[in-house]
Amino acid sequence: NIYLINRHDGYGFRLIIENTSNEDAYNINLTFKLKNNQPFPIQQKVYKETFPIKIMDGKDRKEISTIIAADSDHSFNATWNWRNEKGRNFSRENIVNF
């Protein structure tokens, strides 16, 4: 399973995507869309609020950190697609509130 959580631990808000399955997910391509369906790459930092995202592999807990941005309504549609080492494609959509 892949899930996204909003966590506050004293260092600021963090949106964390974690792979808890036994499937390897080393090749992860994330695409996020705002509520108005405007897509933006994870490298884009033109929005007012940005949050770090941590991607953790379910097996060896390797982490990949990046930054995404959210809209002013504190809610956005998140869509991410990834492919594991066996070539299987996965996709998940979620509305994220923070």
Identify the residue ranges that each predicted region occupies.
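Amphipathic alpha-helical "stem/stalk" segments
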Residues: 1-98
